[in-house]
């Protein structure tokens, strides 16, 4: 294989576990393509990768282990990463889905009590325990497809206590399943009815004090916002981001989904982890993201569910050198999707992304979009031993198949956790 096709550890002592007789898609950026390695082995020591590369290059001090698994020639990829979800919410919006199919407009749905108002009402009303119980099946579905890291946003409270409740529930989920959960504070998601037409007051009274509390309680790993005509302006989001920056919290942004307000450029000016959606992103915005190292997170589930016509400018992002990630955008209204494998197929089919781009988008680039690239997202020495073993003949099957899950095993922090 061309390039550096191994990752050697520096620590001494036997490996904790060996996965032998495998084929690797390392996603190592120092290698060509997906970083494929044949006749490969992964050595794990104390939950971290000590070596990932050709069996012939395995150091002697790692050649024996407490446990050895013969992978039978199967493919191993980094564990998948869903870097944009709204996984915690109350109720569901199946009724408005039926209304939309029958021709109801957004306004008619809203008047009937649907839309985000419905999710806010249900999320406010439910206890932590019920929200956990409702979120677990969604979480389990993602984990069953080889996902080991998931971002979860608040944003269906729109008052301080419910926003914090959602973040606490997300933290609770991490204690109930073998998964890494990253939280984003998204009070700047919409304006509640009692602040209609008073965005500035809502930010002053709710968003900023809630951010302070979320930070003080260690509930927020990042701060998000929705920059759009139906949500918040660039100037309004700038206030939120300035407060996040003062507290040392990274930012990310829903931007350019329905129009181009310049949200991506705002995100880039803060060196945001990511800017997400981006259907109406222009060339200037794409270049700004690339220059800032801000990942462009595309969300084909929302594009599909909303029957959008405006495609995100994938070629402009490529030309600018921006890194692209894909995510489910799991939410009750516009993307009730809990399959990252299907998301990859949508990225390829709807957005014309390549197999290599789709695999990179749900591993390495998704890790970067969460600020976790030093920890996970590739099969390299020193990183957490998070990987997925697949019953496939070639990695393209993960993108090509629809409604099929070929996961053989999921390894999280060096432990086999499913199925």
From Swiss-Prot:
Keywords: Cytoplasm, Histidine metabolism, Hydrolase, Iron, Metal-binding, Zinc. Its EC number is 3.5.2.7. Its cofactor is Zn(2+); Fe(3+). Fe(3+) binds at residues 84, 86, 254, 329. It is found in: Cytoplasm. InterPro entries: Amidohydro-rel, HutI, Metal-dep_hydrolase_composite, Metal_Hydrolase. GO terms for biological process: L-histidine catabolic process to glutamate and formamide; L-histidine catabolic process to glutamate and formate. Pathway: Amino-acid degradation; L-histidine degradation into L-glutamate; N-formimidoyl-L-glutamate from L-histidine: step 3/3. 4-imidazolone-5-propanoate binds at residues 93, 156, 189, 257, 334. Binds 1 zinc or iron ion per subunit. Zn(2+) binds at residues 84, 86, 254, 329. The keyword Metal-binding applies. It comes from the Bacteria. Pfam families: Amidohydro_1 (PF01979). The keyword Cytoplasm applies. One of its GO terms (molecular function) is zinc ion binding. Monomer. Forms a tightly packed homodimer in the crystal, but this seems to be an artifact of crystallization. Belongs to the metallo-dependent hydrolases superfamily. HutI family. This is Imidazolonepropionase. The gene is hutI.
